[in-house]
């Protein structure tokens, strides 16, 4: 099987293979969104123990932050994975200069930031900070080093990482959102990009959209959606709006879109 970051591609294929012990999969439909929840209750499987949620939507290049039904569905799945209160740091992982890898940096530009050195707490508004740390080739620091320094300085209740994902199936490209509470564990074997609670000392969540897949198993070639620019632009807006709605439930989608601009 080709590399994949999507848990439901590994465990959510009903009728193809029996589920391993300790894995539960449930699927539901909400409007035009198909939601698959994968819960892994033990270690030693293809993915770390924890909860994974994927939402299958029409191509995100056709959606944006005005699609409130999709945003509400995504926010409703992300919110239970977050701590109920406390500041959250949103980390945009990836290289903004490479389109397929730019989802994280582009998404943090859409996050409603409420923290700042001269910003007083506002009742009912959750403290949120957002940063895109760049790539190690440009900074000289690994993602783990940068994330660790930020966590030690800000003491967030949780770290939410946004990254471009890899899919094993072409029809999933630009059509799937995934959230998890297991940390950031890319399919590629670069462990300096792995972020989780054991390494950082705070809960680490991950969010993303698949933007590429291996062309052939074992070969260093990738396939991206034809409308990759649209997937990144609209996907970042959609993810940003869902993150904002999950973090700020007292504000409507319309209010949050106006505040972000």
Model regions and ranges:
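Long, charge-dense
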Residues: 106-139
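A structural signal for small-residue-enriched, beta-sheet-centric alpha/beta enzyme cores
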Residues: 131-132, 145, 161-261
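Gly/Ser/Thr-rich loops at beta-strand to alpha-helix junctions
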Residues: 93-103, 137, 164-168
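Short glycine-rich or small-residue beta-strand-to-loop segments that form or flank ligand, phosphate
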Residues: 56-58, 87-98, 130-134
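A glycine- and small-aliphatic-rich helix-loop capping segment at beta-alpha/alpha-beta transitions
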Residues: 77, 99-116, 176-185
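Catalytic-core regions of hydrolytic enzymes
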Residues: 128-159, 164
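N-terminal amphipathic/basic leader segments beginning at the initiator methionine
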Residues: 1-50
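An N-terminal, well-structured beta->alpha segment
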Residues: 42-82
């Amino acid at each position: 099987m080709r590399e994949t970051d999507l848990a439901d591609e590994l465990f959510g294929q009903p009728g193809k293979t029996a589920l391993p012990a300790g894995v539960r999969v449930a699927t539901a439909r909400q409007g035009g969104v198909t939601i698959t929840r994968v819960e892994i209750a033990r270690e030693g499987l293809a993915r770390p123990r924890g909860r994974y949620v994927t939402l299958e939507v029409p191509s995100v290049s056709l959606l944006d932050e005005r699609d409130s039904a999709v945003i509400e569905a995504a926010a409703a799945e992300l919110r239970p994975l977050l701590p109920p209160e406390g500041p959250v740091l949103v980390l945009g992982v990836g290289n903004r200069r490479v389109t397929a890898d730019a989802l994280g940096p582009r998404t943090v530009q859409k996050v409603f930031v409420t923290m700042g050195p001269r910003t007083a707490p506002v009742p009912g508004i959750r403290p949120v900070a957002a940063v895109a740390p760049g790539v190690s080739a440009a900074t000289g620091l690994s993602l783990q080093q940068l994330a660790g320094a930020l966590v030690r300085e800000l003491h967030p209740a949780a770290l939410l990482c946004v990254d471009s994902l890899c899919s094993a199936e072409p029809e999933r490209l630009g059509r799937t959102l995934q959230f998890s509470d297991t940390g950031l564990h890319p399919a590629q074997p670069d462990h300096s990009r792995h972020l989780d609670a054991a390494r950082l000392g705070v809960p680490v969540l991950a969010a993303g959209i698949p933007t590429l897949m291996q062309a052939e198993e074992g070969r260093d070639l990738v396939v991206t959606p034809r409308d990759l620019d649209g997937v990144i632009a609209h996907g970042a807006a959609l993810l940003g709006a869902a993150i904002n709605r999950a973090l700020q439930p007292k504000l409507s989608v319309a209010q949050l879109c106006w505040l972000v601009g």
